[in-house]
């Protein structure tokens, strides 16, 4: 399991936060069940490297003590997009967690080959599982979807030990008819002669 080191922040002022950001560090907080919240700071590049690879569960070493943590929330600057704060949740072995996991679509839908349009629904789903079973992402095969078909949460193939906490009927992806096809159908319906008695 990946591991990064954090230092304890003694000050929690705006000036201290700005100083840390200038030094290439990200201020954050580590918390968990029966654990007092601890203000920490981590190397921005190390954290961004893990996050970019989809890793949200790793070990965090604070003053020589290592905890397994989950990245619960990331805050970015609204203008620059720079990472400015992180929340770490300490996880316990044997205790299930809930976490947002991205859904990655793969395959070229049959309906798209026929001229349809692939539309995206949920791009992330909340899953419940043990920390060691947490997937980086969930793959969804859309290659068999025809025009008018959709892939729902209940259709997802999940790894062992993982359960999705979402409405089973929520749409992940659907194949809609091309606009000109819809317009042609509407014109045909409108121009069809009415049956006379």
Curated annotation (Swiss-Prot):
Any one GO MF annotation of this record: 5S rRNA binding
Its biological purpose: This is one of the proteins that binds to the 5S RNA in the ribosome where it forms part of the central protuberance.
CDD domains with a match to the protein in the record: Ribosomal_L25_TL5_CTC
Cellular-component GO terms for this entry: cytosolic large ribosomal subunit
Protein name: Large ribosomal subunit protein bL25
Record PANTHER family: RIBOSOMAL PROTEIN L25/GLN-TRNA SYNTHETASE, ANTI-CODON-BINDING DOMAIN-CONTAINING PROTEIN, RIBOSOMAL PROTEIN L25_GLN-TRNA SYNTHETASE, ANTI-CODON-BINDING DOMAIN-CONTAINING PROTEIN
Entry's family note: Belongs to the bacterial ribosomal protein bL25 family. CTC subfamily.
Species annotation: Carboxydothermus hydrogenoformans (strain ATCC BAA-161 / DSM 6008 / Z-2901)
NCBIfam families: bL25_bact_ctc
């Amino acid at each position: 399991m990946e591991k990064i080191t954090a230092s304890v922040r003694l000050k929690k002022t705006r000036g201290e936060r700005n100083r840390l950001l200038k030094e290439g560090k990200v201020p954050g907080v580590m918390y968990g069940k029966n654990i007092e919240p601890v203000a920490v700071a981590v190397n921005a590049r190390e954290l961004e490297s893990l996050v970019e690879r989809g890793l949200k569960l790793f070990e965090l070493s604070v003053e020589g003590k290592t905890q397994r943590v989950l990245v619960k929330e990331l805050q970015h600057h609204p203008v620059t997009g720079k990472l400015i704060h992180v929340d770490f949740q300490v996880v316990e072995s044997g205790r299930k967690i809930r976490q947002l996991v991205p859904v990655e679509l793969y395959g070229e839908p049959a309906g798209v080959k026929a001229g349809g349009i692939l539309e995206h629904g949920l791009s992330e789903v909340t899953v419940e599982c043990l920390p060691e079973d947490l997937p980086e992402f969930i793959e969804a095969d859309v290659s068999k979807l025809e025009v008018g078909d959709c892939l729902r949460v209940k259709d997802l193939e999940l790894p062992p030990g993982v359960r999705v906490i979402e409405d089973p009927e929520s749409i992940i992806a659907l194949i809609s008819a091309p606009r000109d096809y819809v317009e042609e159908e509407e014109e045909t319906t409108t121009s069809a002669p009415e049956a006379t008695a």
